């Protein structure tokens, strides 16, 4: 895995069974020394080349299973390990054009030993009041290439 949260490997358009491009995908790694349960994750807003992508257009694939943001919120059993990146799939008819694209995405998660005052202030779209990248509390940016 790469050091950056947004991984370059796996950034590509997605095709359906008829060969039509229905969107794109990219991978993110968990910047934490322990894994987390899906219910702990707080997905943020994705921007691609400055365009906002709505959360309902994104699914997360973890351990080979695909989840919506709503499904993750209530999943207390599925565990995301630090050694396995998640695949985020974005519904976008026609996908992305070949070339470079700027991705901006933040997510964070709760922790049992994180003080409540910090958990109450979690906003995956903004930098945290306390800089703690190990909790994913920062917005990630990366320029990636689709060929």
Swiss-Prot record:
Q: How is its activity regulated?
A: Activity is strongly reduced in the presence of chelating agents.
Return the InterPro entries for the record: CGDB
Q: Which UniProt keywords apply?
A: Carbohydrate metabolism, Lyase, Manganese
Quote the record's note on pH dependence.
Optimum pH is 6.0.
Its UniProt entry gives the catalysed reaction(s) as: 3''-dehydroisoorientin = 1,5-anhydro-D-erythro-hex-1-en-3-ulose + luteolin; 3''-dehydroisovitexin = 1,5-anhydro-D-erythro-hex-1-en-3-ulose + apigenin
Membrane spanning stretches: none
Q: Manganese among the record's keywords? A: yes
EC number(s) stated in the UniProt entry for this protein: 4.1.99.-
How does activity fare over a range of temperatures?
A: Optimum temperature is 60 degrees Celsius.
> What Pfam family does this protein match (any one)?
CGDB
This protein's cofactor list reads: Mn(2+)
Q: Cofactor note from UniProt?
A: Can also use other divalent ions such as Ni(2+), Mg(2+), Zn(2+) and Ca(2+), but Mn(2+) is probably the native metal ion.
At the top of the EC hierarchy, this enzyme's class is lyase
Give GO MF terms, alphabetically: lyase activity
> So which domain of life are we looking at?
Bacteria
Query: Belongs to which family?
Result: Belongs to the C-glycoside deglycosidase beta subunit family.
What's the stated role of this polypeptide?
A: Carbon-carbon bond-cleaving enzyme which participates in the metabolism of C-glycosides. Acts on the C6-glycosylated compounds 3''-dehydroisoorientin (3''-oxo-homoorientin) and 3''-dehydroisovitexin (3''-oxo-isovitexin).
Describe the protein's quaternary organization and the partners it interacts with. Heterooctamer composed of four alpha subunits (DfgA) and four beta subunits (DfgB).
Protein name, entry field: C-glycoside deglycosidase beta subunit
Species the sequence originates in: Eubacterium cellulosolvens (strain ATCC 43171 / JCM 9499 / 6)
């Amino acid at each position: 895995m790469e050091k950056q949260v947004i991984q370059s490997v796996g950034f590509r358009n997605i095709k359906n069974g008829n060969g039509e491009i229905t969107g794109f995908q990219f991978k993110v790694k968990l910047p934490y020394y322990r894994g987390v349960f899906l219910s702990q994750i707080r997905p943020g807003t994705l921007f691609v080349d400055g365009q906002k992508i709505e959360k309902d257009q994104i699914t997360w694939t973890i351990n080979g299973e695909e989840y919506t943001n709503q499904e993750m919120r209530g999943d207390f059993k599925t565990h995301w390990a630090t050694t396995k990146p998640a695949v985020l799939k974005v519904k976008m008819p026609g996908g992305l054009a070949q070339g470079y694209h700027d991705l901006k995405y933040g997510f964070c998660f709760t922790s049992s030993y994180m003080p409540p005052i910090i958990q109450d202030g979690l906003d995956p779209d903004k930098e945290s009041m306390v800089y703690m990248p190990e909790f994913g509390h920062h917005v990630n940016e990366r320029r990636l290439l689709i060929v």
